[in-house]
Amino acid sequence: MLEVALKLLEEITACGFKAYIVGGFVRDYILGINSNDIDITTSATPKDIKEIFEDSCLPSEDYGSVTVIMKGIRFEITTFRKEIGYIDNRRPAEIKYIDDLYEDLLRRDFTINTICMDEEGKIVDLLNGQEDLKNGVIRTVGVSKERFEEDVLRILRAVRFATILDFRLDSEVIDAIKDTRELLRGLSYNRKKEELDKIFGSSNANKGVELLLGLGLDKYLELDNLSKVKCTSSLIGVWTVLDVLDKYPFSANERELITACKEALNYNNLDPYTLYRFGLYANSVAGEINGYDIKEITETYNNLIIQAKKDIDITSKDIMDALGRGPGSYLKEIYGDIERQILSGRVVNEKSRILEYICSKY
């Protein structure tokens, strides 16, 4: 991927423009972390890029970005720019194309994200980002408070980078976050969740939770249960404890899983019927939160006599024929009873034995 990106840079520079890989990819490259997201910054305008690459697309010329596809790989190319004014502490009110890399880098968030790579693969570091990488520091470009007021999402990005990279926040960054954290109330829940997913889904999530609490961000993110969070191997487990389905946006699948996990939290996650009712995933997530041994939960689940309704050796028609009745809500009641009886070992999961039990009781 890097070879393709460098080839792309060569094609741009061959036309008389400056072009560099910038941001997260270069940062991760220096740290020895694999990355598949390459951003390119250039003195060429979107119009110039479109003339150079015939197969490029132009989704938003207003923001000076073009997506170029080379050898099946998508590259985001952004023109050097200066941002003038900000709207809603999130978006620039106006952008002005410029021809200076240094000035372009001054608008960016953190020094570690300003390191560039040229078409020869050489590192270009105009703001000493490598020094902060070496020292494990998250430092803003310029005055921290101004950077956060320009774009409040940067507060969560600071926490994310400190969490994922296991870096520390610069003292000025900490003070500025505390001064501007109330602006998080105006940030969309979609944006907040995107960043929080990355923080809570990190292998270093405990640090992320500690930072959010230490900076007092739980109040402004409306995460009242954050202090109760026990970071699990599942992101769903964190959201289950946070209990914010009524505030934050979740997919239908996430909602279903969180709801099941939340219910399973109230039961013994080694109980056969609980395992059968909520399934292995929900019980594993809830069990980890409740302090159960996940291996024991898995073994118990795998040894269940039945794991789903389809495993029961009887059909609704069998029940109706045995009782001489038609369809009705009573079938659900009987099935629920049968499930408990089989899982407890009181009734053998054989058609004749199940029918014998049903006929004697109903």
Locate each region found by the language model.
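Catalytic cores of the polymerase beta-like nucleotidyltransferase superfamily
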Residues: 1-362
